[in-house]
Curated annotation (Swiss-Prot):
Interacts with histones H3 and H4. InterPro entries: PH-like_dom_sf (IPR011993), RTT106/SPT16-like_middle_dom (IPR013719), RTT106/SSRP1_HistChap/FACT (IPR050454). SUPFAM superfamilies: PH domain-like. GO terms for cellular component: chromosome; nucleus. Residues 371-458 are annotated as: Disordered. It is found in: Nucleus; Chromosome. The gene is rtt106. PANTHER family: FACT COMPLEX SUBUNIT SSRP1, HISTONE CHAPERONE RTT106. Keywords: Chaperone, Chromosome, DNA-binding, Nucleus, Transcription, Transcription regulation. This is Histone chaperone rtt106.
Length: 458
């Protein structure tokens, strides 16, 4: 019979040849590990059909290339607003370069790593498959139902990668934040340069449940292994000019432990930017504020100076003056309602990195680009700054001195009438009337705005 004849034909490929990867099949089916494995299994059982599978793979690749190329003009001619256009283009940007990047991103390439059921928060909030491609490396997210790539970023355009604990959660989790070039909230791109959006996803503590190598082999699920360690390792292996940054106690740790997980150190500080609540992290490469859009990352070389305002008994504000790379214009960012318990740790961090003095900003920028300039004067200034009392400590000491004077002059019959002078009268009355909690909290938390409110209206 013909069937018997086919199956009795001698194999034309050795076992060694079959066990190796076939480039055409890798290119065509790299994004479909399960299907790719079935193809290799079929080749192993019937190696005489390897040329047929290669032809199918070539045809599949050509179809996908044609489909990718056919959508390029559509990405360019949208007349939508810029923000909407970026969203339509899945976070890759706009213009001809953006369309080409989109086509490259969506082209099915062989995978080096993928993890299913990953909870993304930016730029979309949904569960997707996290992928890292081999060769021309992209980090991208794929819809698990439609199998379409939703968004992504070339790894060689990533500026910062952060792995940060998620605050105020009973279960331990980590947020991975991918900040591409020009997406840090400080630096704007040159005209015509596409800007990928920041990408953020959350990983639970413990072994990975659905992580695989590019060959479809499950990894990271053994005892003692964690998904956080696995993702961090994979990213570090594929990043060319940066590494994953994590918070550490040597840089900064909050004076208050993690409230929802007893005994665990907290690395964040709660703060407000306007009405938006978020968390500040003081890291080895800069200061991060998240986790709501837009994320902000202040690299050391972009910080001109940091100062304190509205220093009260329980809270203070942090002001960061930042400058985009290559720009003379500065931007000021105020973070308010920071707990006084953390002022000492924050001040130590700021002094350690010389962020309190605008005259050291050029030295920080030079260090970023490895420029060896004359350091004697700047180092001398830095040393004197280290020896001097910090601005926050000075304000704190003056406030305590005023409170001591108020206690010495206190007259119980005066009911807290104006015993001090100038702008310190409200702060002194806060201390004398500490039992009146509601009134105190309003005065303290209004910060500098309280100075313009009559005392009888607080």
């Amino acid at each position: 019979m013909a069937f018997a004849t086919i199956n009795s034909a001698p194999p034309t490929h050795t076992a060694a040849q079959i066990s190796t990867q076939i480039p055409t099949i890798e290119d065509a089916f790299g994004a479909e590990p399960a299907l790719k494995k079935r193809i290799y299994d079929a080749i192993g059982s019937t190696p005489q059909y390897i040329s047929l599978f290669e032809d199918i793979a070539r045809y599949t690749s050509s179809l996908r290339t044609r489909n990718a190329n056919s959508v390029q003009p559509i990405q360019v001619v949208h007349d939508e607003p810029a923000a909407k256009k970026r969203k339509l283009e899945n976070g890759i940007g706009q213009g001809t370069g953006g369309a080409q990047s989109l086509a490259d991103l969506k082209t099915h390439k062989a995978l080096q790593f993928y993890m299913q059921d990953v909870s993304f928060a930016m730029p979309q909030r949904k569960k997707l498959t996290l992928e890292i491609t081999a060769g021309n490396k992209y980090l991208r997210a794929r819809n698990q139902t439609s199998k379409e790539v939703e968004f992504g970023v070339p790894l060689d355009r990533v500026q910062q990668v952060l792995c940060l604990p998620v605050p105020e959660k009973t279960q331990r989790q980590f947020n991975f934040c991918i900040i591409p070039q020009y997406a840090d909230g400080i630096n704007s791109p040159p005209n015509g340069v596409p800007v990928p959006e920041a990408v953020m996803w959350t990983i639970n503590d413990g072994p990975a449940k659905a992580a695989f190598s590019g060959h479809g082999q499950q990894i990271g699920n053994q005892d003692g292994e964690t998904a956080e360690d696995l993702v961090r390792q994979v990213l570090n292996e594929n990043l060319s000019h940066t590494q994953v940054i994590r918070p550490c106690a040597q840089e900064f740790a909050s004076a208050m432990p993690e409230g929802h997980r007893k005994g665990e150190m907290a690395y964040h500080v709660k703060a407000f930017r306007g009405s938006k609540e978020g968390y500040l992290f003081f890291l080895s490469t800069g200061i991060f504020f998240g986790y709501k859009k837009p994320l902000l990352f202040f690299a050391f070389e972009n910080i001109d100076s940091i100062s304190y305002t509205s220093v009260l008994q329980r809270t203070f504000n942090l002001n960061i003056v930042a400058r985009a790379t290559g720009s003379d214009e500065t931007q000021e960012f105020e973070f308010s309602m920071i707990d006084q318990a953390d002022y000492s740790g924050i001040d130590t961090y700021i002094k350690t990195h010389g962020l309190q003095d605008a005259s050291l900003a050029e030295a920080r920028r030079a260090k970023r680009y490895n420029i060896n300039g004359a350091k004697t004067e700047e180092n001398g200034e830095a040393a004197s700054q280290e020896a001097e009392e910090s601005e926050l400590q000075k304000a704190q000491r003056e406030l305590e001195d005023q409170e001591d004077e108020e206690e010495e002059d206190y007259d119980p019959g005066s009911e807290g009438e104006s015993e001090g002078s100038g702008s310190s009268s409200e702060e002194n009355s806060d201390d004398d009337q500490d039992d009146d909690a509601d009134g105190n909290l309003v005065a303290e938390e209004l910060g500098s705005e309280a100075e313009d409110v009559p005392e009888d209206e607080l």
